[in-house]
Amino acid sequence: MATSKINGRAKGKKAELELAQLLRNQGHLDARRGCQYNGLNGDADVIGVKGIHIECKRQEKVYDEAWMKQAEGDVRKGDIPVVIYRRNHEKWKLLIRQDLADIIWQTLTEEQKLSIRDRVKGLYP
């Protein structure tokens, strides 16, 4: 059991470092792994993306409700709790509450919305 827990921690650390690097590559230059030692201090798994509390998960089985509950329980007032997760051989995915996604979308200008639409057009057939 202890070996499994250690391997899980190493896998979690590797995922957090991978996600932080991905976010830096996308322009979030301050993204880095949070300083959590026991997972109980309320820090996000990946920090440095202003206004976003990121819980990072790298598991095959998706526990979206539990993960979101963790993010919402740890989030600082005014930040948006999200879960970013990845399964083997898949791309990273984002979990966010619908009402918070609506708030974000409503704050975008029409120009920003068009830019987003243009960028995702080619992603799907």
Region spans (language model):
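Catalytic phosphate/metal-binding cores of nucleic-acid and nucleotide-processing enzymes, i.e., regions
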Residues: 1-125
